[in-house]
Each structure stands twice: as structure tokens, then as C-alpha cells.
Amino acid sequence: MRKIGIIGGTFDPPHYGHLLIANEVYHALNLEEVWFLPNQIPPHKQGRNITSVESRLQMLELATEAEEHFSICLEELSRKGPSYTYDTMLQLTKKYPDVQFHFIIGGDMVEYLPKWYNIEALLDLVTFVGVARPGYTLHTSYPITTVEIPEFAVSSSLLRERYKEKKTCKYLLPEKVQVYIERNGLYES
């Protein structure tokens, strides 16, 4: 059975924290590859102004293109409405019955697991992999595999704020992503 990691998110913008997490879990669990799963509309972020799907996808392609064991899964972008992990993983497990999926989440989402849509059924579809995030714990009553990663306190919201304040973001996200953001005037206001 193939072992594939999935890291979901809005990737608004994608940054070195996302890449670090994906790479550390890839090596720690001896995965075949890691799929980045951009959300259409995450249920916990409904109502927030999110950058267009086209721009987020382009930035994610730029961020992941250098790693042959990273790819992008468009499953959630093909659906309208909120992106529920259960619905996505139900589709993916039917589409790829020979794959054992390892769904990678940060400490913030580990704490949020009790509120996930259809969590009990989702546990039958994936193995959750929790990685530490500053300010959050990995304690939960749900079964998760934990992977230690170097602490890197960067987030997409921090980067959007830094761009808005016209602060440097060098060394926080890939240079090609920075160039795309600047050329397209993203996060300026």
C-alpha cells in the first residue's frame, strides 16, 4: 500500500513553514510523496477575504515546483462551497484505494479536531499526523501520529500583515512566491 501525506490549507500565501512541515513528515514517516491540498472555502474561515483560487494555486505551484516528492491535489478546488475534509477524503480514498493517507495538521487544528465535520467517520479514512505549532499543544483524545519538527514561527496571516505594513518577508517564503506577490500587488491593503 502506498503512503501519501496530505497537507491542506488556504496557502494564502504558501511559505517555508508549509514546506518544512511537508518535508519533515515526508522523511519521518517514509512517505512516497506529499500532496498539497488547497481549500476552496475552509469552513473555519468562511467570511474572511481570501485571495483568488488562481493566485493561490499559482503561488503554490511556484513554492513546490523544486521538490519532486511534492505535488498539488486539486480535489477541493473542483467543488463549490465549504471544503470539508471528510468529503474530500471520502472521494480520494475511493479514487485511490491502494493509498494510505496521512493527513498533516498543525497544533491549532489538533485542538480543533472535536469540531471537525464528521470526525468519527474521517478517522476511518485517514491517519492524522500532528506537528507542533507555537502556542498550541498536540494533546487530544483522538488518535494522531506526532512528528517533531524544528520550530519555525511563520504563518500566512503574519505574512499578509507584513506585506500590508510593507515589511520584508525575505527568508520567510520562496523567492518566486515573493516575486509573484509583488508583481500582482497582493496583500497591499
UniProtKB/Swiss-Prot annotation:
Known role: Catalyzes the reversible adenylation of nicotinate mononucleotide (NaMN) to nicotinic acid adenine dinucleotide (NaAD).
Highest rank taxon of the organism: Bacteria
Keyword Lipoprotein listed: no
GO molecular-function term, one example from the UniProt record: ATP binding
Family: Belongs to the NadD family.
Entries under CDD domains matching the protein: NMNAT (cd02165)
Record's protein name: Probable nicotinate-nucleotide adenylyltransferase
E.C. designation(s): 2.7.7.18
Gene3D superfamilies attached to this UniProt entry: HUPs
Enzymatic class: transferase
Phylogenetic lineage: Bacteria, Bacillati, Bacillota, Bacilli, Bacillales
UniProt keyword terms in alphabetical order: ATP-binding, NAD, Nucleotide-binding, Nucleotidyltransferase, Pyridine nucleotide biosynthesis, Transferase
